[in-house]
Amino acid sequence: MNYKSKGLLIKSDLSRLLKCYKIYAAIIGVSIAILFSTEQIGLINGNILDTYIQGSELSGIMIAYVFCAFPFATVFCEDLDNKYIRYELIRSNLKRYVVTKIAFIYLTAILVMVLGTILFLLSGRIAGGDWVNESVGCMNVLLNGSYSILLKKEHYFLYCVMYSLQLGLLSGLLSVLAGYFSLYIHNRVTVLALPIIIYQILIECSGNTIYTVFIFRAYNRPMHKDWESFSLILLISIIPTILLGCLIYKKIQKRL
């Protein structure tokens, strides 16, 4: 396959994504999910940082993970059902098709989480909320975690973006997992819900140790340096994603 065909495949997926309402609805959905996760009207402790951290900790954040998977996670079953995959394979090959789709599922989920967070933060600022209230809240806990240098320099917006990026790495993995389930389950609601159920089971079974899904929270810092911690978290997200890609490839190969 030449580079022109590869570019056409990526351009086709990008156009398909941007022209679809799902990604825009998902971004808004993530913002709303964070807000309603706090289960109260207004900002926690009167500030945006506490509201965002608490909102991303409570059970409502799981709805945000569903929104992250919503735009693209069911692409494999959709392409197989409407035979669009055969058109794709004329211009490409199966391996390239699977790699491209998984990349879009994974990166779209991260993008939705980050942009949804940014929308939430901007909404809080427009509503007149302060970034922090140093007399109360979770600042002391956050200062012991990753990216504390951003908090010390009062770069609160950038801190929340980095926090959401780490959550995005988890949402990317969960979205690819949903894509894998979509090859076995035709009910799209169930497909989007299953990774969240697995996520909840992991939380219930693993306890409070950081070396589970909690490692994606930026208030935990598994390594001494921020870049080391981020690299570890990136590997924890990408390696299972690659393994799922291999399973997806084999499953589609059998169905063609």
Residue ranges of model-derived segments:
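Aromatic- and glycine-rich beta-strand/loop motifs that create alpha-glucan
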Residues: M1-A26
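Membrane-helix interface segments
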Residues: Y21-I23, L94-K95, V99, N187-L192
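Central hydrophobic cores of alpha-helical transmembrane segments
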Residues: A26-A33, R188-L202
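Secretory targeting signals
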Residues: A33-V75, A103-L183, A218-S237
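Helix-loop-helix units of permease transmembrane domains in multi-pass membrane transporters
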Residues: V75-T108
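Juxtamembrane non-transmembrane "cap" segments at the membrane-aqueous interface
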Residues: G128-L142, I196-Y211
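Junction motif at the cytosolic side of a transmembrane helix
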Residues: Y180, Y184, S237-L256
